A protein has these predicted regions:
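Substrate-recognition "cap/lid" segment bordering the active-site pocket of phosphatases
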Residues: 101-155
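Active-site neighborhood of HAD-like aspartate-dependent phosphohydrolases
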Residues: 2-61, 172
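Acidic, Mg2+-coordinating phosphoryl-transfer loop and its flanking beta/alpha structural elements
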Residues: 142-179
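Short acidic-hydrophobic, aromatic-tinged amphipathic segments that line or gate anion-handling sites
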Residues: 124-128, 176-183
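Short, acidic loop-to-helix structural element flanking the phosphoryl-transfer center
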Residues: 68-98, 104-109
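Short amphipathic alpha-helix with an adjacent loop that forms part of the alpha/beta core around
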Residues: 133-138, 184-199
Length: 212
């Protein structure tokens, strides 16, 4: 009988904000325009802006306005490891799908930013239904996320999924974790080289919990 663990990763899904793009830093800079005396501590929860004294409605309004007036989604460089990871994934000949739930005001900026930094994916999806990766993949898919809801959604769809270690997901139990995109690409390489079984449980045992 064929061994179900002997598979090759053909497609990867990569989140943007908090994985490739330092959105919190960009939004902090924008908030300082409106709140010059504000305090902006490092995020400890997904809705980090609440710790900055910003209401939900204000956050969404500034998200819209900042994208139009200050290129909120394209002002910063890619996060550590993005370039090296991209190079390794291309060498592995996997299809790269960038998947983000960014608002419509960010769509053009996002595409331009990826091209400007030579991080051009095979596909770019703007969606909150990231489990679609399971349906567009040509074979076995693997993904990286920093939002626990998307992580669970992907995992539930049968996608091998890794959490990008962030304060807002640190308490999520039994989750494989990486500290940068290079580590994710190396996991893909190890699976495709048959060094790690192609199983979610194997990913958990192959990555160590990281304290922030």
């Amino acid at each position: 009988m064929p061994n179900p663990t002997v598979k090759t990763i053909t497609d990867v899904g990569i989140d943007l904000d908090g994985v490739m793009y330092p959105f919190v830093d960009a939004f902090r800079e924008y908030c300082s325009i409106h709140m010059p005396d504000g305090k902006f501590p490092e995020p400890q929860q997904w809705n980090f802006y609440r710790d900055w004294g910003i209401e939900d409605d204000t956050f969404h309004r500034w998200l819209y306005e900042g994208a139009q007036s200050h290129n909120l989604f394209s002002t910063h460089y890619p996060m550590q490891g993005s370039y090296l990871a991209w190079e390794l994934l291309r060498k592995l000949k996997v299809r790269i799908h960038v998947m983000t739930a960014r608002p419509t005001t960010a769509w053009k900026q996002t595409a331009d930013w990826l091209h400007h930094h030579y991080l051009v994916p095979d596909n770019l999806y703007f969606t909150s239904k990231k489990s679609m990766l399971a349906h567009v993949a040509t074979g076995t898919a693997m993904a990286i996320e920093d939002h626990v809801d998307y992580y669970e959604d992907l995992k539930g769809a049968g996608v091998l999924t890794v959490l990008y270690n962030q304060p807002w997901n640190i308490a999520h139990p039994n989750s494989p974790r990486v500290s940068n995109l290079v580590e994710f690409a190396q996991l893909v390489e190890q699976i495709n080289n048959r060094e790690i079984p192609c199983l979610q449980t194997a990913l958990v045992s192959s990555t160590q919990p990281q304290n922030l």
